[in-house]
């Protein structure tokens, strides 16, 4: 009886260890995929943005990460669709940022 209980404990422990290792491996793979995607995104941004525009986008990312992510995704989509023919300079990026910010901004009005 005691041997059976000990055997069950060992089996349970091995199952838990196996699950833990599988979860850890899945997390590592997800992190690796995320890092690869970020590297690809950064490479595309280097191709389509001037250094000044990349700098501005980096500063925006510090203050409004959601806005910066939206702009990055939009630019990648346009790039992949072949709609970006020349590098985007700082002035163009400002206009894009303003337009997307205006679209996504919510105005709250408090009525008395």
From Swiss-Prot:
Keywords: DNA-binding. Pfam families: dsDNA_bind. InterPro entries: DNA_bind_arc (IPR022889), PDCD5-like (IPR002836), PDCD5-like_sf (IPR036883). GO terms for molecular function: DNA binding. GO terms for cellular component: cytosol. Belongs to the PDCD5 family. This is DNA-binding protein TK1278. It comes from Thermococcus kodakarensis (strain ATCC BAA-918 / JCM 12380 / KOD1).
